[in-house]
Amino acid sequence: MTIWEAFFLGLIQGVTEFLPISSSGHLELAQYFLGFEKLQSYVLFNLICHLGTLGSILYMFLPQIKQSLITERNHIFHIILGTLPLFPLVLILKPIKATFDQPQYLGLCFLFSAALLFSGVYFRLQMQKKHSLRDCLTIGLFQAVAVLPGISRSGATISAARLLGWDKQDAIQFSFLLAIPAILGGTFLEIWQFLKLPASEIPPIEIGQFLTGFITSFMIGCASLWAVIQMMTQDKWVYFAWYCLFIGIATTLYFQM
């Protein structure tokens, strides 16, 4: 992997992790066309990029995180509750994920993302001030489904919150705070699986490329978070739905040819 390829993949991760268009789906496509999808070194590189975007959340939402830890600890309980469905559902969906990891199925997942985004824009319950424990669990279920590449985690969770009647600000904040344990847990699980590989299959660590991917995904991730907040508050969320619909159709047609 060259420095420029590392920059390009870090850019994709940073742009797509928080925009509701699926970072995993776009990385799958990019690595397919670059010929990287089967190489262990790029599995590890993806993990580094995910840690970069995790850093973006911690940086951009630091005031809210401090507030949750000091004065509004019920928020922490809501995050834990929303994370609970992730573990059993990931185990259930793991065999399905192995199938949907194939590029030819990405289009279907992008189309599912589009349907979620459209539903979050056009179909909502009456606005509610308080958020129930059931709401947190429901949003957590939507997050678990997003383990499939092509289904956006932020798109699924924000759309679920909007469907349940949450206002825009609460939906965005809960979605991205919910991402912290999800990304951490997923990253450590992947690292654990990676370390169990035979020594002969563990690739050399490319420090320059990994640093490039991490820094790029962090910086672009911060910009993407800002863009998501602006797009949501300005009622431009539906643009992402149309984008997922387009790329879903294009991907499906390409791999059926």
Curated annotation (Swiss-Prot):
What are the TM regions of this chain, as residue ranges?
42-62, 76-96, 103-123, 136-156, 172-192, 209-229, 237-257
Pfam families, per database record: BacA
What keywords is this UniProt entry annotated with?
A: Antibiotic resistance, Cell inner membrane, Cell membrane, Cell shape, Cell wall biogenesis/degradation, Hydrolase, Membrane, Peptidoglycan synthesis, Transmembrane, Transmembrane helix
> What EC number(s) does the entry state?
3.6.1.27
Q: Which residues form the signal peptide?
A: none
What domain of life is recorded for the organism?
Answer: Bacteria
Q: Which reaction does it catalyse?
A: di-trans,octa-cis-undecaprenyl diphosphate + H2O = di-trans,octa-cis-undecaprenyl phosphate + phosphate + H(+)
Top-rank EC class of the record's enzyme: hydrolase
Q: Keyword Cell wall biogenesis/degradation on this protein? A: yes
Indicate where this protein resides in the cell: Cell inner membrane
Task: Kindly give the InterPro entries that the UniProt entry links to this protein.
Answer: UppP
Q: Which GO terms describe its molecular function?
A: undecaprenyl-diphosphatase activity
Which GO cellular component terms are attached? plasma membrane
Asked whether the keyword Disulfide bond is assigned, the reply is: no
Q: How does it sit in the membrane?
A: Multi-pass membrane protein
Q: What else is known?
A: Bacitracin is thought to be involved in the inhibition of peptidoglycan synthesis by sequestering undecaprenyl diphosphate, thereby reducing the pool of lipid carrier available.
Q: Its biological function?
A: Catalyzes the dephosphorylation of undecaprenyl diphosphate (UPP). Confers resistance to bacitracin.
User: Which family does the record claim for this protein?
Assistant: Belongs to the UppP family.
Q: What is this protein called?
A: Undecaprenyl-diphosphatase
Which gene is this protein's source?
Answer: uppP
